[in-house]
Amino acid sequence: MESILSEERKCYICGSTRWLERHHIYGGANRPKSEKYGLVVYLCHWCHNEPPNGVHFNKERMRWLREEGQRAFQKRYPDLDFLAIFRHNYL
């Protein structure tokens, strides 16, 4: 599924259009759910996988992105219970 957070093919964090990678906001066991509900964004390689600021190395950025994901989910799917599906409240 396409992203419910952004229709643009650019880094969700910095806006770059170079070296983009698709990031599932909720990984691990929740990765298929991220895909199902459109909780994916494009990130440039530096904002995705490079220390110290890539989301996989920076807890604050990861937390912010998960908050953004939950807000987008609740707006798009008002009849679904985010907590019941993802087992965590990020807000």
Residue ranges and their predicted role:
Residues E67-L91:
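Short flanking/linker segments adjacent to small metal-binding domains or redox-active Cys/His motifs
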Residues V40-W64:
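Short Cys/His-centered divalent metal-binding micro-motifs
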Residues M1-E21, W46:
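Short cysteine-rich loop/turn motifs with clustered Cys
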Residues L20-G28, C44-P51:
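Histidine-centered catalytic micro-motifs
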Residues R18-E21, L39-L43, G69:
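Amphipathic alpha-helical interface surfaces
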Residues Y26-V40:
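Short linker/helix segments within small regulatory modules
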